[in-house]
Amino acid sequence: MEKFFDSEEAPEQEIDVKNYDTLTQTLKELESGELDLLAMPAELLHGKQLQMYNANCEVLGARTPRTPNMILVSENKLQYQPKSAIILSDSKLVRRQLRRARKGLRVLSTKAFIEINEREEKFEDELEKYSWMEKLRLNEEIDGFIIPRVIYSEVEINGRRHSLLPDPHNLGDSHYLAHPYSDLVVIIGRKNFPKSISELFTETEGDTIWKIQDYFLSSMDEKQLETIGVLVRHRKLSTLMTQAEKHRDLTMEQSFHDLEGEVITNEILVEFKIEKISSDGKRTISLHRVVPYSKHEIAMVTAKKDWMKFLERAEMNEIKFLND
């Protein structure tokens, strides 16, 4: 939010910004009128929405994520890593994505690496932990590590970086969906707060991302979220068609053209992907939808029904990775 307040997009009105440590205290001050709006990471609201509603507050909108994806710090791209290369990642989702993308890697959490090597390491914060990983890499004790993009800019790293992006270079290549709520900031206020004011801080795409992720993920516990990859974004039809042509994706191309080849919509499109990967990376359950913006609320309801059917069918076929 600091970058937003320093940008040209920031409202012209004078804004008094305060930092708070606890959601409980902040909600009390929102309810009493001492505060007007609260901006917070959406992931911190997960599982606490009842507390928000009890304070007579609600999510008024959200900011579009700027840096949702992770970075691999290594001299080599993933496909060029040596056999049995050691990659550290504290994200269960990313470890599974890396195993899916490349066989033969030793993808470990920080805890596992410390235990295997019988070390005694303690870190005061995330910056110290990732600085330690960079030292391991420079000493050639590991081949690389995964770091959130937002933290990467704060750590002194001289090595090459490789972004883990959601769009494969070629159809069927490796892709990396972000964690649930990744870099998503929600704006919370009292019920019936003036929309004309809250809209100064929110974005339409951010609102869509929050609405769909909340609908799909709010009933999941923290453990379930650890293995879910998700992507929600607005797309221009021209951009999507260029991508479909590049990948020779006839299904996508035909979806937005009639029998005579004419475009059937000029609306902004909403793209939604969700997937769950087995611990060894060998199996993936995924769902992908692209719909016009005006139909995205109806589409997310039907998409969730389809997603639940996929999971139920996997359980019926004794695919055990659903709860691993």
Regions found by a protein language model. Name each.
Residues 1-24, 96, 100-324:
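Small-molecule-sensing regulatory modules
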Residues 56-78, 177-193, 197:
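Hydrophobic/proline-rich hinge and linker segments of small-molecule sensing/allosteric domains
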Residues 22-28, 77-80:
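Short acidic low-complexity segments
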Residues 70-87, 101:
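Flexible hinge/capping segments at coil-to-helix
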Residues 26-69:
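Short beta-strand-centered segments that line the small-molecule binding cleft or hinge
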